[in-house]
Amino acid sequence: MSLLTEVETHTRNEWECRCSDSSDPLVVAANIIGILHLILWILDRLFFKCIYRRLKYGLKRGPATAGVPESMREEYRQEQQSAVDVDDGHFVNIELE
């Protein structure tokens, strides 16, 4: 038994949908969601370089510093740098054979 036999059956002219009630609000909502999903997927594939480049580089700028005194900016930079610095005594040596 084919999966298509439950929803569609082949007629002499073309494929015909044998739905009991295609005006059901749930069916209409599912169709709208499906169409929107397809549109968003197409836009994502067309503009993925722009979108992901914006996310990758645009959000890494850090918090806005307008109106923040220079001393606080420098303190923030030092905190960020100290969080990145690695203690040389805690390296793990992994040898690959």
Swiss-Prot record:
Alphabetic keyword roster: Disulfide bond, Host cell membrane, Host membrane, Host-virus interaction, Hydrogen ion transport, Inhibition of host autophagy by virus, Ion channel, Ion transport, Lipoprotein, Membrane, Palmitate, Phosphoprotein, Signal-anchor, Transmembrane, Transmembrane helix, Transport, Viral ion channel, Virion
Site keyed Essential for channel activity, possibly by being protonated during channel activation, and by forming the channel gate and the selective filter: positions: H37
Cellular component terms (Gene Ontology): host cell plasma membrane; membrane; virion membrane
Covalently attached lipid (S-palmitoyl cysteine), positions: C50
Keyword Ion transport part of the UniProt annotation: yes
Chain positions with Phosphoserine modification: S82
A biological-process GO annotation: symbiont-mediated suppression of host autophagy
Domain of life the protein comes from: Viruses
Site positions for Seems to be involved in pH gating: W41
UniProt note on regulation of activity: The M2 protein from most influenza A strains is inhibited by amantadine and rimantadine, resulting in viral uncoating incapacity. Emergence of amantadine-resistant variants is usually rapid.
Virion surface face residues: 1-22
Membrane topology, as annotated: Single-pass type III membrane protein
GO molecular function: monoatomic ion channel activity; proton transmembrane transporter activity
Ranges per topology, Intravirion: 44-97
Function: Forms a proton-selective ion channel that is necessary for the efficient release of the viral genome during virus entry. After attaching to the cell surface, the virion enters the cell by endocytosis. Acidification of the endosome triggers M2 ion channel activity.
Cross-referenced HAMAP family: INFV_M2
Name assigned to this protein: Matrix protein 2
Provenance organism: Influenza A virus (strain A/Hong Kong/212/2003 H5N1 genotype Z+)
